[in-house]
Amino acid sequence: MDPQFLVFGQLTREYLLPAMGSARLDVAGGSLLYVAAGLKVWESNVGLIGRVGSDYPREWLNEYKSRGFDTRGIRILLQNMDVREFFAYNDSFEVNHINPVSHFARREMTFPKSLLGYQPPNEKSADKAGVLSVTDIPNDYLDARAAHLCPMDLVTQTQLIAGLKRGTASTFTLDPAPSTMTMAARRELPALLNGVTAFLPSQDELRNLFWGAKHDLWQMAEAVSLYGCEYVVIKCGARGQLLYDSNTKRKWEIPAYPARVADPTGAGDAFCGGFLSGYCRNYDPLEGVLYGNVSASLKLEGNGAFYPLDVLPGLAAARLNALKDMVRQV
């Protein structure tokens, strides 16, 4: 069966030093994977669109297939690609992406040779070979009903949405890249967000977009809504989420489900996947936030993108029912 839900994003090779437990070195990661897993907590027909180099482990791609994902949209390039990501968490679960040598030394661990020459994403030039284009979308994927775009450059996201509109998809959710959320880039947002169903920035990204101009998150959400998206969902980490409805001007606060935090990597992405599923059930944004909230809570409690898929059956549904009573309309 052709996928009904599409996720566009990046696949990476993670090197992760957690706040507790063993290091996880050279494991499958990337926003594409975390969103897809958060979506698959609730749905089955999920298609992945991304690019990897010829050096990307084939056994990982085989695992994605065995998990039930449609991987026809993952394009394997002829060249190698450096898709390494480094995460080091302190005891407060604050993350650091730079200077991995010092973090390994501090923990008295041998520095892995496979991490030599690593540069954090904000310091290395973007690999143009990894940039997605409309031609990466298999024709069969154009029959999908909904799509989520992970963080990537503004031009690419705009072009992908335009390409998807040639098909049957009517629901588009979008997580912005940090480079999009600057005052300088703000004038480009109307072209990106016009026709987008839900815009899903973090509170830090939104504050950066309105740096010095606005201080209230609700005012920021209202301002962004004027760019053409139907809903603005602000991801606030441990505080949960804020939901703003552009049409009715209604506002909700949804607290984070009280999960036991083991590894926060990808929790925001898992939220986006869950949101897409929940929203498409009845086209209710609040239902979307609740589903996303639960997906994020499952990811927080374990390591790896697929941890939410291996929890006890019925756990997600139980959390969803409990969370409904915690919502507050502002």
Give the location of each predicted region:
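Short beta-strand scaffold segments in enzyme catalytic cores
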Residues: 37, 85-87, 240-244
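Alpha-helix C-terminal capping segments
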Residues: 36-45, 278-281
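Conserved N-terminal subdomain of the carbohydrate kinase-like
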Residues: 13-21, 45-146, 317-330
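Short catalytic helix/loop segments, enriched in acidic residues and glycine
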Residues: 21-37
